[in-house]
């Protein structure tokens, strides 16, 4: 992983591919490369570092009608020029780029080595191109050799290949990894992410898992399954507004996306809510009838959103809710009762562990699967029974902000819908909840316009922070701690406030920074008790509380006040406070806010 881009057409492919790769950098990278075909030459260039490094190595005179490129985030082999994509076969006749992980690469590599194939990298990707080249030398059939190669692979992959014998052809394929075609007039773009080519084409085709495409200059796209049966695919038009990569005057994408949250909430509420209840179209095609348990599966920030959903749904509905990290779910062999509902959450819709969990649910009878996703046409969206889109728009910052709070809002609304269908919430309580959530855009703007941006952490030189919260605030603390780890590079751990006395309090010494979320009125007094425990051990307490809880100043060293709101809206507002705190601390420490080290935006490998 992390990003594929390619072009075939009448224009010069080289600058187009380099531009496309630069737009994929937000997904994560440690190296980049490009391969281009001319009539008599296969040109390959690679570099470690950002795409700008690659651009400096490619001559502006280089011209080709067919090229592929890749931004890499290391999974097999350290970041290096040798391990960067594209990879070529031992005769340097063809080049390939690949996202994903080939699980049987070692077996394939050993078999090829025994036949005299020489490898030049440590990657699983090189196995694919060497395997293809070996088959092509036997058969001379480009497409058949590509199809045969794909069927030998175990794991997940999206890949693109060019061959110097066929300078007018580009081959690409996918299996449980995203790949999108952008169609123009006598030209085709390919990318892991539609936003990378949206400037040039809004007509798209999404390759489904188990499909390959044959692109020829001046010819229509041909799509097949791996058995080479022809497939007809619909062309979809995507809105250019979905692809903005402009910072719009902000210093960082993360800050821009924090400020976009009121508009995101307005979009969600417009689609989902009417004045005192739900729009008829919300989950119209999906029934909760007969559901006896819920299983929420996700990774990272999406997992934290699922944790809040458990608290919220179980507070309203008399059914159990289980929340699992996707990477553990697949291997834990959990018992899933019939008449369960699985909710899978992924911003990108391509998170490998979450998709693996989806495969497990698909093996079960009488289990319905609902997706929560931000990307139409994604693998997750295409394979669940129904998908609710969070309408967050493109999120470029690696640390999730608007997508996370959009997930929170959608999950809270889903819980209210479930409670309403099961008649476990009164019409009056439902009306008050919906009205309270409809206040979110206004309250978010109010908070973002407050003095919060003047806040500076007096403990920014500390290397370890503790976050405490109870009930609805605990999952929000978990997310805040993750944000601090991701972009400020400090150790941060979140605990239920009541658990301090059961071990973590041993970490407290004079000056230890403890950030306490006091936003849940149901457990406010209990949370104050936790503050007193750590203050007695001379901790430095930063308290986040509602504006009506000014008394918090008497027991804390610093205070951040969040506008009063409905209890279901409060976690979202407190989550935004955590985002701003992490952003501010990252600035104080001088770290890379939008592209933190070692992290990728879309984790397409397990």
Swiss-Prot record:
- Write out the GO biological process terms: carbohydrate metabolic process; fructose 6-phosphate metabolic process; protein N-linked glycosylation; UDP-N-acetylglucosamine metabolic process
Q: What is its EC number?
A: 2.6.1.16
Where does the protein principally reside?
cytoplasm
Cellular component annotations (GO), alphabetically ordered: cytosol
- Catalytic-site annotation from UniProt: 2, 601
Q: Which cysteines are joined by disulfide bonds?
A: none
Pfam families according to UniProt: GATase_6, SIS
Repeat as a keyword?
yes
Q: Enumerate the spans annotated as SIS domain.
A: 278-424, 455-596
Q: What class of enzyme is it?
A: transferase
As given in the record, the signal peptide range reads: none
Compartment(s): Cytoplasm
Q: Which residues form the Glutamine amidotransferase type-2 domain?
A: 2-218
Instruction: Name the keywords, alphabetized.
Output: Aminotransferase, Cytoplasm, Glutamine amidotransferase, Repeat, Transferase
Extract the GO molecular function terms from the UniProt entry: carbohydrate derivative binding; glutamine-fructose-6-phosphate transaminase (isomerizing) activity
Q: Give a yes or no for keyword DNA damage in this entry.
A: no
Q: How does it assemble?
A: Homodimer.
Report the protein name in the record: Glutamine--fructose-6-phosphate aminotransferase [isomerizing]
- List the top taxonomic levels of the source: Bacteria, Pseudomonadati, Chlamydiota, Chlamydiia, Chlamydiales
């Amino acid at each position: 992983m992390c990003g594929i881009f390619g072009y075939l057409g009448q224009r010069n492919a080289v600058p187009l591919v380099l531009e496309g790769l630069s737009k994929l950098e937000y997904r994560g990278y440690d190296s980049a490369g490009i391969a281009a075909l001319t009539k008599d030459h296969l040109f390959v260039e690679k570099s470690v570092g950002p795409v700008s490094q690659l651009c400096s190595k490619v001559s502006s005179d280089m011209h080709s009608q067919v090229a592929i490129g890749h931004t890499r985030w290391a999974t097999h082999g350290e970041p290096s020029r040798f391990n960067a994509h594209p990879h070529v076969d031992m005769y340097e006749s063809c080049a390939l780029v690949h996202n994903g992980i080939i699980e049987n690469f070692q077996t394939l590599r050993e078999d090829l080595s025994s036949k005299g194939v020489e490898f030049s990298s440590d990657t699983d990707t090189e196995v694919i191109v060497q395997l293809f080249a070996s088959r092509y030398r036997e058969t001379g059939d480009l497409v058949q050799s590509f199809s045969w190669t794909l069927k030998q692979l175990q794991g997940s992959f999206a890949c693109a290949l060019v061959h110097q014998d066929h300078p007018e052809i580009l081959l690409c394929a996918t299996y449980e990894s995203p790949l999108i075609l952008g169609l123009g007039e006598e030209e085709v773009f390919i990318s892991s992410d539609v936003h990378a080519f949206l400037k040039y084409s809004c007509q798209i085709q999404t390759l489904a898992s188990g499909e390959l495409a044959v692109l020829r200059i001046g010819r229509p796209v041909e799509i097949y399954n791996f058995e080479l049966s022809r497939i007809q695919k619909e062309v979809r038009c995507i809105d250019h507004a979905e692809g903005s990569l402009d910072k719009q005057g902000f210093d960082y994408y993360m800050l821009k996306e924090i400020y976009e949250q009121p508009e995101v909430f307005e979009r969600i509420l417009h689609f989902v809510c009417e004045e005192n209840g739900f729009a008829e179209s919300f989950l119209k095609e999906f029934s909760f009838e007969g559901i006896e348990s819920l299983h929420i599966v996700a990774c990272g920030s999406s997992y934290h959103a699922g944790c809040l959903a458990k608290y919220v749904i179980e507070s309203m509905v008399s059914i159990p809710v289980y929340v699992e990290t996707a990477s553990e779910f697949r291997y834990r062999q959990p018992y899933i009762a019939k008449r369960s509902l699985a909710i899978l959450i992924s911003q990108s819709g391509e998170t490998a562990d979450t998709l693996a969990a989806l495969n497990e649910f698909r093996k079960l009878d009488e289990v319905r699967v609902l997706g929560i996703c931000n990307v139409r046409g994604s693998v997750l969206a295409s394979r669940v029974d129904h998908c609710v889109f969070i309408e967050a728009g493109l999120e470029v910052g690696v640390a999730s902000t608007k997508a996370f709070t959009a997930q929170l809002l959608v999950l809270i609304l889903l819980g209210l819908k479930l409670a309403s269908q099961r008649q476990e919430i009164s019409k009056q309580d439902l009306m008050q909840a919906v009205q309270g959530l409809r206040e979110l855009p206004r309250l978010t703007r109010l908070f973002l316009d407050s003095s919060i941006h003047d806040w500076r952490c007096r403990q920014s030189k500390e290397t370890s922070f503790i976050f405490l919260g109870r009930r609805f605030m605990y999952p929000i603390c978990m997310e805040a701690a993750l944000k601090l780890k991701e972009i400020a590079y400090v150790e941060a751990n979140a605990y239920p406030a009541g658990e301090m006395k059961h071990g973590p309090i041993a970490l407290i010494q004079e000056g230890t920074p403890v950030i306490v979320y006091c936003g849940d009125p149901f457990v406010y007094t209990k949370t104050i008790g936790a503050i007193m425990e750590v203050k007695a051990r001379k901790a430095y307490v930063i308290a986040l509380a509602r504006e009506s809880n000014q008394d918090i100043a008497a027991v804390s060293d610093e205070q951040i006040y969040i506008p009063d709101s409905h209890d279901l809206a409060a976690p979202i507002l407190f989550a935004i406070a955590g985002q701003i705190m992490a952003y501010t601390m990252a600035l104080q420490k001088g770290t890379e806010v939008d592209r933190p080290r070692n992290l990728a935006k879309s984790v397409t490998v397990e």
